[in-house]
A protein has these predicted regions:
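An N-terminal domain-start capping segment
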Residues: 6, 76-83, 136-147
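Short polybasic/polar patches that bind polyanions
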Residues: 41, 135, 194
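A short, structured surface patch at a secondary-structure boundary
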Residues: 28, 34-82, 86
Length: 260
């Protein structure tokens, strides 16, 4: 159990912000992306508004989103009137909401960041985005310090993982009781695993975003008895009560071995 918790923490290293820089006077920034909001907080900047802020405690958890941050609503259906009323100096987005860009530009300048592309190196893209955002905010030193702390942490975790020598990992998110999203090449998780010397059991196809949605039974070739399966929260409410009775799930060798 202790090793499992350590592995979970190691995987989260590339996804969660490190300790934030000291807050200082900053522009009023709204963001339509959790990752960009995380980066702002790590740079010592609290956004004035975030899309889907209500779901932050389920999908992000740490760090907690300050209570004063305004919820703009679901990312593709954000409350544009509310956003305009907040008078932001800058709006941060991703290509995922490109269809809104022209309307957003009527409110404030827009800065868009892309982490997932054909290069399939999202961690490197995230590093570059961090430095680009830090430069825009006049926080270059904070941006470089953030990346330096991350590299130091990766190095320390790699040493510990080399000693424990964990087996292959299978990273999944349940979509419903019969289907999962499994993460492979091109995902941020894969980049983190590569840096830590961890092995991904999934060698199947993956989308541009580094995952593939498959039936539970399709996990079997990757879910050998030596594989540990990690599931990400939140798990749909209807899944947990039925999972123990699912023959598709219970017959996976990794599940039979108790590696779940």
């Amino acid at each position: 159990l202790a090793r499992r918790r350590f592995l979970q923490g190691a995987l989260a290293t590339g996804l969660l912000p490190l300790p934030s820089a000291k807050a200082a006077a900053s522009p009023r920034i709204a963001t339509l992306d959790y990752g960009l909001a995380n980066t702002l907080l790590s740079l010592g900047v609290t956004p004035i508004a975030v899309a889907a802020a209500e779901g932050w405690s389920d999908w992000v958890v740490e760090p907690p989103l300050p209570s004063e941050v305004v919820d703009l609503g679901v990312d593709r259906e954000i409350n544009l009137e509310l956003l305009a009323a907040l008078s932001p100096d800058l709006i941060l987005t991703t290509p995922y909401v490109q269809s809104l860009r022209s309307r957003l530009e009527e409110i404030a300048p827009v800065l868009s960041f892309s982490v997932y592309n054909e290069n399939k190196r999202p961690f490197r893209q995230a590093q570059e985005a961090t430095l680009r955002l830090a430069e825009r905010l006049g926080r270059e030193a904070e941006g470089r310090a953030l990346l330096d702390r991350a590299e130091t942490l990766f190095a320390a975790l790699s040493v510990r993982l080399h000693v424990s020598d964990p087996g292959p990992l299978l990273l999944v998110r349940f979509m419903d009781a019969r289907h999962v999203r499994v993460y492979g090449g091109g995902s941020l998780f894969q980049d983190v695993m590569d840096r830590l010397g961890l092995r991904n059991a999934w060698e199947g196809p993956a989308t541009l975003w580094g995952f593939e949605t498959v039936g539970v039974e399709q996990l079997a070739p990757a879910a050998g008895p030596e594989t540990e399966i990690f599931t990400f929260e939140p798990v749909p409410q209807e899944v947990l009560p039925t999972l123990g009775n699912s023959p598709l799930w219970r017959r996976l060798p990794a599940v039979e071995a108790g590696n779940f």
